């Protein structure tokens, strides 16, 4: 079927200015017949159509193009192919033989380009208390329960959030060589602010590093050491709430006329007297009706958002916790104002900073180009991947918005889910979003697949070849397990590596290296070429190269004739070997393969 996506092969300028002209291209297989084709786009809310013309043609395909003028900040468009007795639409969700809503139309946003460095980044998520413990003795706060390093975390108990294992930022610094050797070039930290919990999402200050982690001094040393290794650091900010131990709340409770009083929502019907996130007294909800709060958080010259992006503190960007709920409570909806305000503040002090938000569900309304650069792509990536390879029927679906255990789907359902969710956002937002297999809030992938190493490798291969910014939760690369978010926050056993899956670690290193070296995986589009129940294959195509990716979740016997796609195999890159024009995969277990392809046809026009 005809193909178009937002990558460089199909869109001449992904970040145009209003008034610029952009060339849109469609690749059409010779087997597909039509009389005429048009692009339909919206100018000032009104649909307009422009006919495509033949640009070039080869043995297996032809390329059709149209030049359009960008009239609005956001331009939605789709293509239609007309024949004698039919018409068919092509939008970001796929091909349709009937009229469909414009929610999944392709989109071009006329704003400056997103930070270029994120495309070639692979991030490593670190939960500071559980990654590495230095020899420096740190204070144990009164709220904490000290634990031995290699104990398992307690799950579902009152002490779960107060167990401290002793990981700190100095420990991270001491293991940066490991991080570098793994191949990642970014570290995403869950919060490092002072708090009354091990997860630190209940900040008692946003302007300093928790002394339990080594304080500001440890952070400065870590930033310097990371910079030498060309590793960027991503902070984690809770703009939705603070902790009950924050001085803002104490001042607000003492003085009803204080400016801090406006920072919160008040509720006399609950014992603690204020609205907490999900009713939790430990997490007072922030009220952005307060101009003073906005100044503190992001608008002011020395605001929290800006402080940590300064050269002194060295963060490369922010991950916004529960970004979808920030600025929202009942009838109050200041979400877009706050989101845009945070983005504006970041652009003022560090234009190349990355802004990515947590959003466990529908992300389209937040990723229109003007707020978050991207989101943690749970619904458009992690959830369909889990559903496709899940062997563990005991894992609940609550975190992913399901009132039942994770279901089982086939390959077609996986691809259609991905197209549905990812097709609702601009391509530039998709590639700026974080793709992940798990996190500190979920079960770990090794547990999802019931310890099946080959199946885990299938998931990891998909993670490191799919559009977006891959994020690996520390420990996944050595096969750490965990049946829930709380259980997944296990420590890294640095002293005894006999429990490490070293063979899997080697595979992950190789895949990360491939991801960072190959332009097709950095700048390429996404074209599905094989979709079966148990196996999938797709092309990542850029101006410089083409890579074919194959994965299976079990036994398969299939062939991919790349000559029908206009290619031949140039070299095998990873996993299954292949050459010539036909790649054969006959296996009784989960399998992976990557091949560099080269064109077998001459395009003329």
What are the language-model segments listed below?
Residues 2-14, 18-22, 26, 36-38, ...:
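Active-site and adjacent substrate-binding regions of carbohydrate-active enzymes
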Residues 78-82:
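Extracellular recognition modules
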Residues 45-47:
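Short, solvent-exposed loop/linker segments at beta-strand-coil boundaries, enriched for Pro/Gly
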């Amino acid at each position: 079927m005809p193909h178009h996506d937002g990558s460089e092969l199909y869109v001449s300028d992904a970040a145009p200015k209003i008034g610029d002209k952009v060339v849109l291209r469609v690749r059409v297989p010779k087997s597909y017949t039509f009389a005429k084709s048009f692009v339909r786009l919206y100018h000032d809310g009104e649909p307009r159509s422009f006919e495509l013309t033949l640009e070039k043609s080869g043995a297996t395909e032809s390329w059709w193009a149209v030049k359009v003028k960008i009239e609005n900040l956001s331009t939605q468009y789709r293509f239609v192919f007309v024949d004698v007795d039919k018409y068919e639409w092509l939008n970001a969700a796929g091909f349709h033989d009937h009229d469909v809503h414009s929610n999944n139309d392709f989109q071009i946003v006329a704003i400056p380009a997103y930070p270029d460095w994120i495309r070639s980044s692979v991030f490593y998520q670190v939960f500071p208390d559980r990654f590495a413990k230095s020899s420096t003795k740190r204070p144990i706060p009164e709220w904490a329960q000290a634990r031995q390093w290699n104990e398992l975390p307690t799950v579902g108990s009152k002490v779960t959030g107060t167990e401290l294992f002793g990981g700190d930022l100095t420990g991270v610094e001491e293991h940066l060589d490991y991080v570098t050797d793994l191949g990642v070039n970014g570290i995403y930290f869950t919060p490092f602010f002072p708090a009354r919990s091990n997860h630190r999402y209940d900040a008692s200050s946003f302007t300093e590093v928790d002394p339990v982690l080594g304080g500001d001094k440890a952070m400065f040393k870590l930033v310097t050491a990371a910079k030498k290794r060309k590793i960027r650091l991503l902070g984690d900010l809770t703009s939705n709430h603070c902790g009950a131990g924050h001085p803002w709340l104490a001042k607000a409770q003492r003085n009803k006329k204080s400016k801090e009083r406006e920072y919160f929502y008040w509720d006399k019907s609950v014992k603690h007297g204020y609205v907490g996130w999900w009713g939790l007294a430990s997490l007072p909800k922030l009220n952005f009706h307060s101009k003073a709060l906005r100044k503190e958080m992001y608008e002011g010259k020395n605001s929290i958002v800006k402080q940590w992006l300064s050269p002194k503190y060295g963060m490369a960007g922010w991950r916004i916790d529960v970004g979808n709920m920030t600025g929202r409570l009942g009838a109050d909806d200041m979400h877009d104002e706050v989101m845009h305000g945070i983005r504006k503040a970041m652009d003022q002090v560090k234009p190349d900073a990355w802004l990515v938000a947590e959003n466990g569900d529908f992300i389209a309304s937040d990723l229109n180009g003007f707020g978050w650069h991207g989101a943690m792509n749970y619904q458009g990536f992690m959830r369909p991947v889990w559903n496709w390879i899940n062997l563990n029927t005991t894992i609940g679906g609550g975190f992913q918005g399901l009132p039942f255990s994770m279901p089982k789907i086939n390959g077609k359902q996986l691809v259609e889910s991905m197209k549905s969710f990812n097709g609702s956002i601009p391509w530039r937002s998709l590639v700026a979003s974080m793709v992940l297999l798990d996190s500190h809030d979920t079960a770990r992938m090794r547990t999802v697949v019931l310890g099946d190493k080959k199946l885990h490798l299938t998931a990891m291969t998909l993670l490191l070849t799919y559009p977006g910014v891959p994020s690996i939760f520390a420990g996944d690369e050595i096969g750490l397990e965990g049946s829930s978010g709380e259980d997944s926050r296990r420590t890294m056993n640095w002293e005894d590596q006999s429990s490490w899956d070293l063979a899997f670690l080697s595979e992950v290193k190789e895949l990360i290296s491939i991801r960072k070296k190959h332009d097709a995986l950095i700048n390429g589009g996404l074209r599905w070429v094989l979709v079966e129940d148990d196996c999938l294959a797709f092309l990542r195509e850029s101006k410089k190269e083409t890579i074919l990716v194959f994965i299976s979740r079990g036994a398969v016997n299939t062939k991919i004739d790349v000559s029908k796609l206009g290619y031949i195999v140039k070299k095998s890159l990873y996993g299954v070997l292949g050459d010539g024009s036909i790649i054969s995969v006959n296996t009784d277990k989960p399998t992976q393969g990557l091949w560099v392809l080269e064109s077998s046809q001459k395009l003329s026009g």
